[in-house]
Swiss-Prot record:
GO terms for molecular function: 5S rRNA binding; structural constituent of ribosome. It comes from Anopheles gambiae. Belongs to the universal ribosomal protein uL18 family. Residues 262-273, 282-291 have a biased composition (Low complexity). The keyword Transferase does not apply. Keywords: Cytoplasm, Nucleus, Ribonucleoprotein, Ribosomal protein, RNA-binding, rRNA-binding. The gene is RpL5. This is Large ribosomal subunit protein uL18. Component of the ribosome, a large ribonucleoprotein complex responsible for the synthesis of proteins in the cell. The small ribosomal subunit (SSU) binds messenger RNAs (mRNAs) and translates the encoded message by selecting cognate aminoacyl-transfer RNA (tRNA) molecules. The large subunit (LSU) contains the ribosomal catalytic site termed the peptidyl transferase center (PTC), which catalyzes the formation of peptide bonds, thereby polymerizing the amino acids delivered by tRNAs into a polypeptide chain. Pfam families: Ribosomal_L18_c, Ribosomal_L5e. GO terms for biological process: ribosomal large subunit assembly; translation. Gene3D superfamilies: 3.30.420.100. Its main location: cytoplasm. The keyword Nucleus applies.
């Protein structure tokens, strides 16, 4: 079929239907979303969970969510900016950090569902493919599906690093090794050792050594945070090993500290909760209100409009002339 030019006439604009708002903004791929949220009809109201992975310039977000008519509901979430709590203070957006974030969200959701003791996941990380095996007596493994959004699903992408961390954490996510680092499409072979190096950040350590030998100024500029914290190339593997172990101990999220309201400034303080406002209005005052000593001045009454000075007009009637006889 040849090229057909679209005729934008009156009928075209009359029948035109705009796309969804998030499609117009380029935020949601509804073709993929429809297949991620539609549940089998014989499962009725059972939610279909998704592992949502989103990448930004400074953070990695992993969420467990399911769809409802009114909107998606987030069950559990983990962020890479929480990793300094577990010992990873720099490199919060690389492949190793994505693995740690996926591991963190997996341990949190299993702890929330009280499945963390039944499904410990893969404790010895080798980079090879790992599939969760269901226990004989007990509930099945938590199953969810990877949601990458609009990210490119290339081989070695960080979204698959987060998925690998979630799988090693004990979640049942259908996947293959074709998108992990170390897979060769030409030979159709998978190098698990290369994948392990990416999980423990050894590819960053090798680049640090190479850059330090070739260009020391570029090394100081690119790895300034590593240098300020005293982190060397030989320390990176142990940092991530300790982080994996510490994530499994307290995966729960720490309650954020509430800041005290400002005493003064441009913006007013926060509104008090209803209970405090109710008690404040019902409690008696410590002293009665004092009456004013001086009597307030009464407002001056205004005269009616027709009594005003300019309205008073003297009507002079013309005198009749004397009658002549």
């Amino acid at each position: 079929m040849g090229f057909v030019k679209v005729v934008k006439n009156k009928q075209y604009f009359k029948r035109y239907q705009v796309r969804f708002r998030r499609r117009r903004e380029g935020k949601t791929d509804y073709y993929a979303r429809k297949r991620l949220i539609f549940q089998d009809k014989n499962k009725y109201n059972t939610p279909k969970f998704r592992l949502i992975v989103r990448l930004s310039n400074r953070d990695i977000t992993c969420q467990i969510a399911y769809a409802r008519i009114e909107g998606d509901r987030i069950v559990c979430a983990a962020y890479s900016h929480e990793l300094p709590r577990y010992g990873v203070k720099v490199g919060l957006t690389n492949y190793a950090a994505a693995y740690c974030t996926g591991l963190l969200v997996a341990r949190r959701i299993l702890q929330k569902l009280r499945l963390d003791t039944l499904y410990a996941g893969c404790t010895d990380v080798t980079g090879e493919e790992y599939l969760v095996e269901p226990v004989d007596e007990g509930p099945a493994a938590f199953r969810c599906y990877l949601d990458v959004g609009l990210a490119r699903t290339t081989t070695g992408a960080r979204v698959f690093g987060a998925m690998k961390g979630a799988v090693d954490g004990g979640l049942n996510i259908p996947h293959s090794v074709k998108r992990f680092p170390g897979y060769s499409a030409e030979n159709k072979s998978f190098n698990a050792e290369m994948h392990r190096d990416h999980i423990f950040g050894l590819h960053v350590a090798n680049y640090m050594r190479t850059l330090e030998e070739e260009d020391e100024e570029a090394f100081k500029r690119q790895f300034s945070k590593y240098i300020s914290l005293g982190i060397k190339a030989d320390d990176i593997e142990n940092i991530y090993k300790n982080a994996h172990a510490s994530i499994r101990i307290p995966p729960s999220r720490r309650n954020p500290r509430r800041r005290s309201p400002r005493s003064g400034g441009r913006w007013p303080s926060c509104r008090s909760p209803p209970a405090r406002r109710r008690s404040r209005s019902t409690r008696p005052t410590s002293w009665p209100r004092s009456r004013p000593t001086s009597k307030p001045k009464r407002p001056r009454r205004r005269r009616p409009f027709f009594f005003s000075s300019w309205w008073c007009i003297i009507l002079v009637l013309p005198c009749s002339s004397p009658v002549r006889r």
